[in-house]
Curated annotation (Swiss-Prot):
Protein name in the entry: Mediator of RNA polymerase II transcription subunit 4
Positions with biased composition (Low complexity): 259-270
Location of the protein in the cell: Nucleus
Quaternary assembly: Component of the Mediator complex, which is composed of MED1, MED4, MED6, MED7, MED8, MED9, MED10, MED11, MED12, MED13, MED13L, MED14, MED15, MED16, MED17, MED18, MED19, MED20, MED21, MED22, MED23, MED24, MED25, MED26, MED27, MED29, MED30, MED31, CCNC, CDK8 and CDC2L6/CDK11. The MED12, MED13, CCNC and CDK8 subunits form a distinct module termed the CDK8 module. Mediator containing the CDK8 module is less active than Mediator lacking this module in supporting transcriptional activation.
Keywords: Acetylation, Activator, Coiled coil, Nucleus, Phosphoprotein, Transcription, Transcription regulation
Annotated positions of the Phosphoserine modification: 32
InterPro entries according to UniProt: Mediator_Med4
Chain's role: Component of the Mediator complex, a coactivator involved in the regulated transcription of nearly all RNA polymerase II-dependent genes. Mediator functions as a bridge to convey information from gene-specific regulatory proteins to the basal RNA polymerase II transcription machinery. Mediator is recruited to promoters by direct interactions with regulatory proteins and serves as a scaffold for the assembly of a functional preinitiation complex with RNA polymerase II and the general transcription factors.
Gene this protein is translated from: MED4
Feature: compositional bias, Basic and acidic residues: 236-250
Family: Belongs to the Mediator complex subunit 4 family.
Domain of life according to the entry: Eukaryota
Pfam families reported in the protein's UniProt record: Med4
Length: 270
């Protein structure tokens, strides 16, 4: 009778009995099997206690309860194995999810880099197209090298791209001196020993007058006279006020002594 009551309880319990619904989760099935084991164990213990107190032998009912208990225990063990397998699968799923997240971040990074590369390539293609248009336009309106050389000669012969600070409209001078002007300048005269004996030394009359000779005089208004004075040698800075050596007083005394000696020698000879 106890076995019948236990069977009825199993049928009433959701998910209980041998034919538990397969649509339930493994956790629910494990809890149901555990409850069945608990109920069967209590009934078996109660039956054993009653039979011991009353000293009645009802081995048939005890065997039925024991068989049910063993059967439910087998189901419980199978469910435990299934739960372990599902746990392993769940762990693998978590690992795969992390790997998927990592791959997803890598894909997003690559997508970002590809977008940047696409922008760079689009800019490069646009610039290349513009250059091709310029090249095609230059080919259509090509200019010979002779015309370019003539134009360069015209620029070098007339004016340049910049002018001196003192340049005013109508000034025919070039912004920089020509080769002829450079040769006739101060540096050119210093390097030319055949021009008025100038080879690092200036004429005495020019130094005595405190001015530069006409050859070395500045040819442009932006050349300062101070610059010309600074170009003079330092050993001539205080020699301009000195008298020539022939007009010294000591030289005059020497001349008088020599004349006296000559007159005395002439008188002795007489």
């Amino acid at each position: 009778m106890a076995a019948a009551s236990s069977g009825e309880k199993e049928k009433e319990r959701p998910g209980g009995g041998l034919g538990a619904a397969g649509g339930n989760s493994t956790r629910e099935r494990l809890l149901s099997a555990l409850e069945d084991l608990e109920v069967l164990s209590r009934e078996l213990i109660e039956m054993l206690a009653i039979s011991r107190n009353q000293k009645l032998l009802q081995s048939g009912e005890e065997n039925q309860v024991l068989e049910l208990l063993i059967h439910r225990d087998g189901e419980f063990q199978e469910l435990m194995k299934l739960a372990l397998n599902q746990g392993k699968i769940h762990h693998e799923m978590q690992v795969l999810e992390k790997e998927v997240e990592k791959r997803d971040s890598d894909i997003q990074q690559l997508q970002k880099q590809l977008k940047e590369a696409e922008q760079i390539l689009a800019t490069a293609v646009y610039q290349a197209k513009e250059k091709l248009k310029s090249i095609e336009k230059a080919r259509k309106g090509a200019i010979s090298s002779e015309e370019i050389i003539k134009y360069a000669h015209r620029i070098s012969a007339s004016n340049a791209v910049c002018a001196p600070l003192t340049w005013v409209p109508g000034d025919p001078r070039r912004p920089y001196p020509t080769d002829l002007e450079m040769r006739s300048g101060l540096l050119g005269q210093m390097n030319n020993p055949s021009t008025n004996g100038v080879n690092g030394h200036l004429p005495g009359d020019a130094l005595a007058a405190g001015r530069l000779p006409d050859v070395l005089a500045p040819q442009y208004p932006w050349q300062s006279n101070d610059m010309a004075m600074n170009m003079l040698p330092p050993n001539h800075s205080h020699d301009f006020l000195l008298e020539p050596p022939g007009h010294n007083k000591e030289n005059e005394d020497d001349v008088e002594v020599m004349s006296t000696d000559s007159s005395s020698s002439s008188s002795d000879s007489d």
